[in-house]
């Protein structure tokens, strides 16, 4: 039991540390992605003067209007959120994975499905702990100073102000808008993110590629891109719902949000910011590869071993 508890803490710390570093490095891409993704909601609310023309234009415009440091706006909330989220994801994923206990050689597809299920379940459990921080990070990142030409005032002064104003206008429920569809999205994303990586790792990272950080990074990048694109429309819906807390007009449900976006903006609007999301996947790949590297150092685990 003592050994299991020690391994759990190592999983918790290794996952959280690698996540915090990677997310901070990718914070500028993350903010650009969120701005492009939610720009139509911001324009409707009068929080954005004109739409962004692409990743480059959004980056340049944000720096020009708000300063270089603004690219990290919302990152503090993201690190606070992401450390326990990713740490719990990794730690619980291994707990859930051991519950299935299928043999990879004798029952490959059951083992594969077990990896998918354990990754999804870990993500859903973790989300319930830190959703309000994800909401706060989204609102801060989309709080642009371009509501009118020449710049405008911020809607929020910081993390605490997001909580204060949201609770004042919408109550606690305002912090959890979009939670249900987020649970669906997190199961899809984490299920692919962890399940595919753990399933492909012992198959791909063998021989000369075993313990190869670059190979692990590239595999993680590919998995992160695939998982991100598969769940991206769900991510757009949940964040658009988050953006309506504090506004007069809200979506009745996630399905209503989906209908309104498709009807008024077209299907392509569900994928706005997906290009930046692919660049952001570098951070996700770094988390996966870095986590494995830390486990090699701390526990003696190997990339290709497939060990829990």
From Swiss-Prot:
Residues 238-243 are annotated as: Important for transport activity. One of its GO terms (biological process) is mitochondrial ADP transmembrane transport. Solcar repeats lie at residues 6-99, 110-203, 211-297. A motif (Nucleotide carrier signature motif) lies at residues 238-243. It catalyses: ADP(in) + ATP(out) = ADP(out) + ATP(in). It is a multi-pass membrane protein. Keywords: Antiport, Membrane, Mitochondrion, Mitochondrion inner membrane, Repeat, Transmembrane, Transmembrane helix, Transport. It comes from the Eukaryota. It is found in: Mitochondrion inner membrane. ADP binds at residues 81, 93, 238. Gene3D superfamilies: Mitochondrial carrier domain. ADP:ATP antiporter that mediates import of ADP into the mitochondrial matrix for ATP synthesis, and export of ATP out to fuel the cell. Cycles between the cytoplasmic-open state (c-state) and the matrix-open state (m-state): operates by the alternating access mechanism with a single substrate-binding site intermittently exposed to either the cytosolic (c-state) or matrix (m-state) side of the inner mitochondrial membrane. Monomer. The transmembrane helices are not perpendicular to the plane of the membrane, but cross the membrane at an angle. At least 2 of the odd-numbered transmembrane helices exhibit a sharp kink, due to the presence of a conserved proline residue. This is ADP,ATP carrier protein.
């Amino acid at each position: 039991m003592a050994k299991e508890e020690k391994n759990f803490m190592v999983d918790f710390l290794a996952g959280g540390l690698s996540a915090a570093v990677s997310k901070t490095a990718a914070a500028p891409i993350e903010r650009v992605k969120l701005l492009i993704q939610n720009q139509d909601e911001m324009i409707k609310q009068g929080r954005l003067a004109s739409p962004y023309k692409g990743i480059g234009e959004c980056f340049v415009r944000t720096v020009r209007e708000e300063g270089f440091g603004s690219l990290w706006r919302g990152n503090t909330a993201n690190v606070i959120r992401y450390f326990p989220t990713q740490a719990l994801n990794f730690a619980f994923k291994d707990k859930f994975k051991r519950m299935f206990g299928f043999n990879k050689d004798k029952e490959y597809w059951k083992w594969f499905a077990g990896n998918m299920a354990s990754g999804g379940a870990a993500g859903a459990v973790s989300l319930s702990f830190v959703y309000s921080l994800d909401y706060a990070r989204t609102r801060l990142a989309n709080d642009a100073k371009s509501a009118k030409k020449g710049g405008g005032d911020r809607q929020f002064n910081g993390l605490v102000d997001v909580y204060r104003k949201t609770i004042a206008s919408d109550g606690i429920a305002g912090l959890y808008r979009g939670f249900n569809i987020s649970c669906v999205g997190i199961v899809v994303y984490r299920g692919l993110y962890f399940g595919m990586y753990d399933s492909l790792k012992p198959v791909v990272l063998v021989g000369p590629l075993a313990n190869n950080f670059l190979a692990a990074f590239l595999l993680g990048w590919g998995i992160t891109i695939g998982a991100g694109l598969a769940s991206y429309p769900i991510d757009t819906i949940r964040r658009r719902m988050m953006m309506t807390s504090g506004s007069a007009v809200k979506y009745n449900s996630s399905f209503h949000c989906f209908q309104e976006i498709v009807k008024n903006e077209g299907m392509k609007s569900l994928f706005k910011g997906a290009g930046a999301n692919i660049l952001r996947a570098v951070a996700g790949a770094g988390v996966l590869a870095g986590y494995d590297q830390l486990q090699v150092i701390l526990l003696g685990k190997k990339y290709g071993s497939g060990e829990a």
